[in-house]
């Protein structure tokens, strides 16, 4: 209920704020940090502290120009008090944000200007003022009381829920583009399941929830030919050009080209990671924290300007484990699908996971061969 309450509060009061630019608040339920709480303006991650469910808090992170990991706050946050912390960050942003330079108008630039210690003291000052001037209603927690159970999930994209005998199916359309006929087919299959619901993920997936084992298996079987079933084919791409007005390259075209190349190679693709593709230096596909990511740019080829992508490797997101990816070089767009195939073949040859290959330099050695 906490993310919903935070969203309702900010929207209800939005007309009263004058912010330099946007401020994002993320909530993750587990240390895996699937909502990227550690790389946002504000991020809450649930955990257990002294036997009670509470939140860890990160501040002033963000992706885009000069991306930055969030700064960990030095105390646990009571779940019922999150609105005090959010309002304090909004007030700090209004007071200290840059209204003159749009390129430096996000919260991640404030600690760089003030220093981390001064920023944290400033935040605590605003938090004290909010506590003195505001009185927020408590948030009623949603408590799950059912006992654990032994699931029978035998498919990687069928997830057992906490609720006994219920499963979630993960469906990923190519490049996150769901065709109307596929959506209608999914809707028809679940329309007579009263408790079924669909949630969307940050990785362009549909989570179809509250299914029995038989219903989950039937949905997977029906959609298997239309949905992507390996991590590399479940890659994430922003919309890119020509739809995006500020985009540089056709990120969707690259995503589709990678999928075609992997399929044509008839190789073991299970060792390849999910790839995050942004069509420009902005981070709509979260390439700055990707294990393998690309951001669009242009390079000269003779007298022509051609599409290319800067490659980012080694990124990771997690509670206390988030790492920014490093830049490995720039690759012409037309060469990237072949590079991905060669990387997959190298992983199979050496029997390594991509994580191992990224750590020991094997992956970077393949990537460097294609860099300009």
Put a short name on every predicted segment.
Residues 94-162, 206, 210-219, 226:
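Terminal amphipathic helices with adjacent charged low-complexity linkers/tails
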């Amino acid at each position: 209920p906490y993310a919903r309450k935070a969203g309702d509060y900010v929207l209800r009061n939005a007309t009263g704020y004058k912010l330099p630019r946007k401020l994002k608040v993320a909530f993750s339920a587990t240390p895996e940090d699937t909502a990227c709480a550690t790389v946002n303006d504000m991020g809450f991650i649930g955990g257990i502290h002294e036997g009670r469910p509470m939140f860890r808090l990160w501040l002033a992170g963000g992706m885009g120009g000069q991306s930055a990991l969030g700064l960990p706050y030095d105390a646990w946050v009571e779940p019922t008090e999150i609105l005090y912390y959010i309002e304090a960050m909004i007030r700090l942003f209004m007071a200290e944000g840059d209204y003159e330079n749009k390129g430096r108008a996000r919260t991640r630039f404030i600690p760089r200007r003030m220093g981390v210690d001064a920023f944290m003291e400033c935040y605590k000052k605003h938090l004290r003022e909010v506590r003195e001037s505001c009185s927020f209603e408590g948030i009623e927690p949603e408590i799950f009381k059912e006992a654990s159970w032994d699931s029978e999930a035998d498919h990687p994209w069928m997830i057992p829920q906490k609720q006994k005998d219920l499963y979630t199916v993960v469906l990923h359309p190519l490049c996150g583009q769901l065709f109307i006929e596929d959506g209608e087919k999914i809707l028809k299959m679940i329309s007579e399941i009263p408790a079924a619901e669909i949630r969307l993920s940050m990785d362009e997936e549909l989570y179809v929830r509250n299914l029995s084992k038989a219903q989950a298996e039937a949905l997977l079987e029906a959609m298997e030919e239309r949905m992507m079933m390996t991590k590399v084919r479940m890659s994430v791409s922003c919309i890119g050009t020509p739809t995006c007005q500020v985009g540089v390259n056709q990120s969707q075209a690259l995503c589709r080209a990678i999928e075609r190349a992997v399929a044509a190679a008839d190789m073991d693709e299970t060792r390849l990671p999910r790839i995050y593709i942004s069509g420009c230096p902005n981070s709509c596909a979260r390439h700055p924290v990707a294990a393998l990511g690309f951001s669009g740019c242009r390079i000269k080829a003779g007298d022509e300007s051609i599409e290319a992508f800067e490659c980012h490797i080694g990124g990771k997101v997690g509670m206390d484990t988030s790492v920014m990816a490093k830049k490995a070089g720039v690759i012409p767009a037309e060469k990237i699908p072949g590079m991905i195939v060669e990387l997959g073949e190298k992983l199979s040859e050496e029997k390594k996971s991509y994580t191992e290959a990224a750590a020991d330099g094997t992956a970077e050695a393949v990537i460097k061969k294609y860099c300009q």
